[in-house]
């Protein structure tokens, strides 16, 4: 798509629960900025977990061509998962940050510190192709997009934008969910520092051509982007997914 102002029929989805409630405080700000930059758009505000996926699917069915998700990495991933599952290449995803980490948006110069700049990037109408990953699991569902291969061998799948992690980063996310005194990037940094010294590691068994990957590791990440956890760098040469292992002895 050329770099002229966005002319796509646009639907904006706000997640007020993103960023531990910070998303609710940014709704009026974003609406004001969007009305100044977009010729017209419609919007909805979620009222329960994962409703953004349903709203995105309905918006596509109603003929909208640009689905804008206002939230953080979780909100963006939920909407992206549904859009990819629908398989309509003419529909684009827009990102406006109001979450805790907002890591995937950093790939495109989208900063949570400047809502006006984020809306400006959206309004320019430039579409950039990006990779997505997909996790499949036999048995337990992995979210809204579930593919059933056979009745005897169900396999569920879920697409992701930023990364899939096991171990240390999961412990950090669990701690952020229980914290009540911080928000945003600082929350991630404080809980990460705490777990850096207390987390013991997890035993992994991996199917890989690389020798010596089994054993205890601090974390395993399968990344599609260079940042996670509120701006922490992770080794991820694009355009391929990168598997990163870190042992407990490799703590910074």
Question: What kind of feature is each model-predicted range?
Answer:
Residues 1-70, 77, 81:
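ATP/NTP phosphate-donor binding region
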Residues 3-5, 9, 86-89, 238-240:
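Short, conserved loop/helix-junction motifs that constitute active-site signature segments
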Residues 17-19, 72-75, 98-101, 166-168, ...:
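Short glycine-rich anion-binding loops that position phosphate/pyrophosphate groups of nucleotides
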Residues 19-23, 130, 229:
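Short N-terminal binding/cap micro-motifs at the start of the first secondary-structure element
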Residues 24-26, 80-83, 106-108, 233-234:
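Short amphipathic alpha-helical segments
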Residues 27-30, 60, 84-85, 177-180, ...:
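Short, solvent-exposed amphipathic alpha-helical segments in soluble enzyme
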Residues 36-37, 46, 85-218:
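Catalytic core of DAGKc-family lipid kinases
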Residues 218-252:
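Internal helical hairpin/lid segments
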């Amino acid at each position: 798509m050329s770099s002229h102002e966005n002319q796509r029929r646009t639907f904006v989805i706000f997640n007020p629960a993103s960023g531990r409630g910070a998303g609710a405080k940014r709704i009026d700000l974003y609406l004001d900025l969007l009305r100044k930059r977009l010729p017209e758009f419609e919007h909805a505000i979620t009222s329960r977990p994962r409703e953004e996926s349903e709203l995105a699917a309905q918006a596509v069915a109603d003929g909208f061509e640009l689905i804008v998700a206002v939230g953080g990495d979780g909100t963006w991933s939920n909407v992206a998962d549904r859009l990819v599952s629908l398989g309509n290449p003419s529909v684009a995803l827009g990102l406006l940050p109001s979450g805790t980490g907002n890591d995937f948006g950093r790939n495109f110069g989208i900063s949570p510190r400047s809502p006006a700049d984020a809306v400006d990037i959206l309004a320019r109408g430039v579409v950039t192709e990006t990779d997505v990953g997909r996790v499949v699991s036999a048995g337990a569902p992995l979210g809204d997009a579930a593919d059933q291969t056979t009745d005897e061998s169900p396999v569920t799948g879920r697409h992701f934008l930023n990364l899939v992690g096991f171990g240390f980063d999961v412990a950090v996310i669990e701690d952020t969910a229980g914290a009540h005194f911080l928000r945003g990037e600082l929350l991630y940094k404080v809980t990460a520092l705490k777990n850096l010294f207390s987390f013991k590691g997890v035993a992994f068994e991996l199917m890989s051509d690389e020798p010596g990957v089994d054993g205890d590791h601090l974390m395993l990440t399968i990344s599609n982007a260079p940042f996670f956890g509120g701006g922490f760098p992770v080794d991820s040469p694009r355009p391929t997914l990168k598997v990163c292992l870190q042992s407990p002895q490799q703590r910074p």
